[in-house]
């Protein structure tokens, strides 16, 4: 098995206990894609890299990188933790879900520098207070092709027109213009505002996003649409998504009643 001692940049996707004193840590690296690292002695008192391998950490490291199998971290150069994500249970849930999707969407050891940058940018936006639900929607939409689902979102899937109202059709693999709605009696009846955001988010450069305001009803509609597509067409159900759904349910119950 070939190994290479080198610098790398990484986003910590998750960590798990391994044996009595060790951790298995999965990083999404800029240079090598997703890699699993064995960190020996990580649970021992006085371990020097404790702060560098906390959840929601990004930074530069030196590692013994294996082509296949486990790699090893030798030292950390410069790291930082997404503090607000770590401290806020809702931001934490959205960030964990995004990283779960990325981990599921791509094979290990496949360099994906563009996606590394997108994930880092998405986490930065959430950490900075940009609407975590909307950042998550953007990532869900842009990840769909990686799961083998690439809906037609820029024009009608039948005729290509983009000057009429749209609806979403799972049967036709994307948008149907109003002239072809009768072709699919089971189209999703999505609002035009929701369709607008769906189309915009599919091509949005996260580097150009600094703030966004979406009405609560539209945010809810986007969540429903993403759930429908991921449930029926993609079939991916990370544990982190179930926890996120529970969180949203708790939040709805905890909202104070409105006065009439």
Curated annotation (Swiss-Prot):
Keywords: DNA damage, DNA recombination, DNA repair. Transmembrane segments: none annotated. One of its GO terms (biological process) is DNA recombination. It comes from the Bacteria. Pfam families: RecO_C (PF02565), RecO_N (PF11967). One of its GO terms (cellular component) is bacterial nucleoid. Involved in DNA repair and RecF pathway recombination. This is DNA repair protein RecO. It comes from Levilactobacillus brevis (strain ATCC 367 / BCRC 12310 / CIP 105137 / JCM 1170 / LMG 11437 / NCIMB 947 / NCTC 947).
């Amino acid at each position: 098995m070939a190994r290479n001692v080198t610098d790398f940049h990484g986003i910590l996707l998750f960590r798990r206990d391994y044996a009595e004193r060790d951790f298995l840590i999965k990083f999404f690296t800029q240079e090598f894609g997703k890699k699993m690292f064995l960190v020996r002695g990580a649970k021992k008192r006085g371990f020097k890299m404790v702060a560098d391998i906390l959840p929601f950490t990004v930074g530069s490291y030196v590692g013994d990188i294996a082509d296949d199998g486990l790699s090893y971290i030798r030292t950390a150069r410069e790291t930082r933790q997404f503090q607000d994500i770590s401290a806020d249970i809702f931001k934490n849930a959205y960030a964990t879900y995004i990283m779960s999707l990325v981990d599921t969407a791509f094979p290990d050891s496949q360099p994906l520098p563009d996606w590394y940058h997108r994930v880092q940018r998405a986490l930065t936006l959430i950490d900075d207070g940009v609407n975590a639900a909307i950042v998550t929607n953007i990532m869900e939409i842009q990840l769909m092709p990686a799961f083998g689902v690439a809906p037609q979102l820029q024009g009608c899937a039948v005729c290509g027109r983009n000057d009429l109202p749209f609806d979403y059709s799972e049967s036709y693999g994307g948008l149907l213009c109003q002239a072809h709605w009768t072709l699919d009696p089971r189209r999703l009846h999505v609002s035009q505002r929701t369709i607008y955001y769906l189309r915009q988010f599919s091509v949005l450069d996260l580097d150009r996003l600094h703030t966004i305001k979406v009405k609560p009803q539209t945010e809810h509609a986007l969540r429903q649409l993403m759930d429908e597509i991921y449930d029926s067409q993609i079939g991916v159900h990370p544990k982190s998504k179930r926890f996120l759904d529970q969180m949203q349910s708790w939040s709805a119950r905890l909202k104070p009643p409105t006065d009439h």
